[in-house]
Amino acid sequence: MSFSRRQFLQASGLAVCLGSLSSSVRAGSVSDRKLPIPPLLESRNGQPLFVTLQKVHWAFDGTQKTEVWGINGSMPGPTIKVKSGDDVKLIYSNRLNEPVSMTVSGLLVPGTQIGGAARMMSPGAYWSPVLPIRQKAATCWYHANTPFKMAPHVYNGLVGMWIVEDEESKSLPLPKHYGVNDFPIILQDKRLDNFGTPQYDKEAATEGFYGDTLLVNGCEDPYIEVSRGWIRLRLVNASNARRYELSANDGRSLYLIASDQGLLTSPVELKSIPMAPGERREILIDLSEGEEVTITAGQSAGFMDRLRGIFEPSNLLRNTNVLTIKPTGLMSLVTDKVPQQLVVDDTQITTSIQPRTIQLQNSPPGINNARWELSRIDLVGKQNGWERWLVTVETPQPFHIEGARFKVINHDGQKPAPADFGWKDTVWIEKQSELLVELKQPSYSHFPFVYYSQILENADKGIAGQMEITPSE
């Protein structure tokens, strides 16, 4: 039996691919990269916080550095921590070669300070908002929200965590030592080429972009070493479109303590926790027994799917390990029990308010038969007012509202699952969800709030609207 030159080259190429595939399987099976912890940037004594948007060199695989976008020299950007009651001055600087706008999702500030189209920064430009922090403790995230380019700008790396702290949260017996027992976890999926460079194809992302590599703080399959006891994970899903279902590989419980807009009234014990794009969660994990555990995000691609992924783009994740946690040493001095009461919330859920209908449409893209238009206000509300929104979708997708917070009344007529308890600003909608919305901050015709599909490609296509919230007297 003889081989032609073409057959020989094909066989040789396949052998190389299979070798690479088996290497990636081996590399992905054991976590050997320590979790990168973004630097902490805190507001102190009224000093401004500098946020520089720039190109950085980053090694997603730990070896080959590639040029991406980042903030203050890192990807993701530093974790910004502020205190409720402070007025925080930011100084954004755009050192990239195209216009960008930024926002902080979850931060309840007036429309003049939130960012967006009216605060677009040209290359070389600055923007210096002063943010009045007047809300309860919460895990938020700051990111690009450049109109019609939100998806590529977030994918390129313009993301970071934003923590609001208040006296009530500081007094609770919860892990709060940043990078020691309180960890920022930013999830993104990307598609990396052979040189470790992220690839993005907007035209192929007809239903949102899905990568094949799960990254946590810009790293694939990382680990952390911690003291025995309880740890806290602050989770942000910064992916363009992918929804995750997080669980422990050994079946242990995860204790949900906070949602998008802050702490729940009491912890919720769960075996798995869904996370839609844009959602934030805070969870506690008990490591007092000293047993290693891996947090996973579902099933990874099988061998044949991996093989196909060598020759054509795949939407399946090669590895779904989020984080391996390795407890060491003696018990932590932090409380050995989950507090039964976190915060008090006496909000009365009511359905007596006249509903407002919000319909997200895919074809043609828009909300209530209108494509996102920067010069148009789509709805008007009143600051501190309460509204009932009936949000419907043609295909399942997450939905986000700026400048407001809400509670989920029901999903498709059914009570929300425990994972959707508490105050939120982002929610996954299968068909129809009913929301009790509190309009916390004012916005204006030239500085409106935006509500949109949190599948970022959908928002860029025009599934978004703008609202003006008239100031209270």
UniProtKB/Swiss-Prot annotation:
Post-translation changes: Predicted to be exported by the Tat system. The position of the signal peptide cleavage has not been experimentally proven.
**Coiled coil spans:** none
User: Which keywords accompany this UniProt record?
Assistant: Cell cycle, Cell division, Periplasm, Signal
> Which CDD domains does the record match to this protein?
CuRO_2_CueO_FtsP, CuRO_3_CueO_FtsP
Look up the signal peptide feature and give its range.
1-27
Cite the SUPFAM superfamilies for this sequence. Answer: Cupredoxins (SSF49503)
User: Has the keyword rRNA-binding been applied to this entry?
Assistant: no
| Primary site of residence | periplasm
Localisation per UniProt entry: Periplasm
Q: Which InterPro entries match?
A: Cu-oxidase-like_N, Cu-oxidase_C, Cu-oxidase_fam, Cupredoxin, FtsP, TAT_signal, TAT_signal_bac_arc
* One GO MF term attached to the UniProt entry: oxidoreductase activity
PROSITE patterns to which the protein is assigned, alphabetical: TAT
**CC annotations in GO:** cell division site; outer membrane-bounded periplasmic space
A GO term (biological process) for this protein?
FtsZ-dependent cytokinesis
Role summary? Cell division protein that is required for growth during stress conditions. May be involved in protecting or stabilizing the divisomal assembly under conditions of stress.
The similarity comment for this entry is: Belongs to the FtsP family.
Question: What is the name of this protein?
Answer: Cell division protein FtsP
Organism in which the protein naturally occurs:
Proteus mirabilis (strain HI4320)
